[in-house]
Amino acid sequence: MIAVFDLDGTVLDSSHRALINEQGGINIEEWRTHTREQILNDSELPLAQYMRDCIKNPSVRVWICTSRNLSRADYDLLDNLGIRGADLILSRDRNDNREDVPYKIAKIRGKLNLPSVRKRERVFFDDRADIRHAMARLGFVCPAPQFWGLYHSA
């Protein structure tokens, strides 16, 4: 199985510093101004435990697909929360200002024809319905947040 996790609003609570745009996405320009201290104040959401369990499971490949432009502080946060061990981290380049849906489609689509990916079951966790819908069209199972409890560890 390949389990793909968004970060903000999915495994991380960054609501203390999020400014939302008209489409429900993060205001990217404002987001990039956050300090290390602000980033390290993000906290984990319940799905983070399932993500850690997936990272520990040798039969599961874990990917992170985030709209964040990851800085050293972001990687330190992932380390602090025990979720940095993902097999692949897809993050936004500094000059990439695309809306979240086309950005994530572009990041993911190129990986789907890899021999190690093609025939595997794929699940995508994202808090945004428009992103889940787009990923479902690419062949992912995309549970809505109200069903994430089924994936939490006991």
Residue map of PLM features:
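Alpha-helical substrate-recognition element adjacent to the catalytic core
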Residues: M1-R98
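Single-residue recognition of alpha-helix boundary sites
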Residues: R17-N21, P115, R137-L138
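Short, aromatic/basic amphipathic alpha-helical patches
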Residues: Y75-I83, K111, H133-F140
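Acidic, Mg2+-coordinating phosphoryl-transfer loop and its flanking beta/alpha structural elements
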Residues: K119-A154
